[in-house]
Amino acid sequence: MAKEEKNLHVLEENFNQLIRERIQKFKNLQEQNKDPFEVYKVERTHTSKEIKDNYETLDGTDVTVAGRLMSKRVHGKAGFSDLYDRYGKIQLYIKINDVGEEKLKEYKSYDIGDILSVSGKVFKTRTGEVSIHITDFQLAAKSLKPLPEKWHGLKDPDLRYRQRYVDLIINQDVRDTFLKRTAVIRAIREFLDGRDYIEVETPILSSIAGGAAAKPFITHHNALDIDMYLRIATELYLKRLIVGGFEKVYEIGKNFRNEGIDVRHNPEFTAMELYEAFSDYNDMMELTENMLAYVCEKVLGTTKVIYQDTEIDFKPPWNRITMVDAVKQFTKVDFNEVESDDEARKIAVEKNIELKKELKDCTKGDILVGMFEEFCEHKFIQPTFVMDYPVEISPLTKKKRGNDKYTERFEGFIFGREVCNAYSELNDPIVQRERFMQQIRERELGDDEAYMMDEDFINALEIGMPPTGGLGIGLDRIIMFLTNSYSIRDVILFPTMKPSQQ
């Protein structure tokens, strides 16, 4: 242990010495009136990609590029370097005959991580690499701290998330992940815009946290002197817009839930919710599978993705199964034959399932859901719609046609994980008020995730909402599948982290 601490101290001292040397170089530049932070703009003519893609027409042409110096192999009177911009790498070649002795000396003093603008002629080396023969250059920003050489040598496993800016510089695969994230969201917008949906923005701060069973973040509005909540879902505001006559609406934005953090959950996450008048949950199933297949084709060129060594195919149609049939398939218990809450409670004891409230307070529906979560959901690897959830846990959903113990609700599962949730939306204001009152009773029993009463939403339903289908998708989880990312932190640029002690 003492030897390890000594080695760590030596590494830290060497690192600090490198910083001191870089700061001294910066001071020297200031004394020469070459302060890089006095550079306000770089007039670059091309990116690295444009030069490589158009080499045949640009060969011998003067260009100006800009980016970060990531390697330097300059010895004696000439040498090569690598400059990285948003699109990738371009090789640079510098020679004393072209820039002069003083400029070459200055160039040699630059450090890995410095930001440069470089002018020169496009050419191809004997090995066939498209490069720039430097005729002029300028330091556009000085890197005062060295970049880590390789992430696997770092002691803090969370440093990639805490210093995402460094992670993006070092790791091309990380940059690719977030470029795909952007492409996924763009493709979803294209799909919905092409079907005449209207993108809207609804409040993030609200006096009522509604639309989902979740624990909200609470804040206080000083001027109004009221507690307010960060939204946990966009549902109730979007339904108000359906009432207002916007027949197809969607929103992509942040939701916030004051709950645990793990590989699938971040307190701040991105969701897409949409609502369509005169449709039901069957329409939402069809829309979901078609939209996600479209996104896969657009971003990856195929509906098949490899996730954690498993091939997943997003191609429609997805599998469909009711929750009752899923439980019957994997546990041999048929809840269609269970006639009372007491009988269901006996099954819960026999199966030793974990429930979210006291057994005596659980209904048949609560126990059905507990059985599904315990024994079934992890079984659905290929995209599957699990349909017809109990009415007890679906307060915003219409009852199932022909069986009022269940609702017209489905959740989509991929690789054993829930990725979406959809309903035939409840539009009866009298029933909705009764459902909210039941949720209030659940809250009084200690369920701090139960829904709050929302009188204005009831008022909107009383004005009249047409039959409506609604869908919510956790975009971070979809992006995890399309980028083969194990943790949700790998697809969120700046995930929620406990403050560093350093």
From Swiss-Prot:
Gene Ontology biological-process annotations: lysyl-tRNA aminoacylation
Protein's cellular compartments: Cytoplasm
Cofactor(s) demanded: Mg(2+)
Binding of Mg(2+) 1, residues: 411, 418
InterPro entries: Aa-tRNA-synt_II, aa-tRNA-synth_II, aa-tRNA-synth_II/BPL/LPL, Lys-tRNA-ligase_II, Lys-tRNA-ligase_II_bac/euk, Lys-tRNA-ligase_II_N, Lys-tRNA-synth_II_C, NA-bd_OB-fold
Reactions it catalyzes: tRNA(Lys) + L-lysine + ATP = L-lysyl-tRNA(Lys) + AMP + diphosphate
Co-factor note (free text): Binds 3 Mg(2+) ions per subunit.
Top-rank taxon: Bacteria
Gene3D superfamilies: Bira Bifunctional Protein, Domain 2, Nucleic acid-binding proteins
PROSITE patterns attached to this UniProt entry: AA_TRNA_LIGASE_II
Residue numbers binding Mg(2+) 2: 418
EC number: 6.1.1.6
Keywords of the record: Aminoacyl-tRNA synthetase, ATP-binding, Cytoplasm, Ligase, Magnesium, Metal-binding, Nucleotide-binding, Protein biosynthesis
Keyword Ligase among UniProt keywords: yes
Subunit (UniProt): Homodimer.
Protein name in UniProt: Lysine--tRNA ligase
Origin species: Clostridium kluyveri (strain ATCC 8527 / DSM 555 / NBRC 12016 / NCIMB 10680 / K1)
Gene name linked to the record: lysS
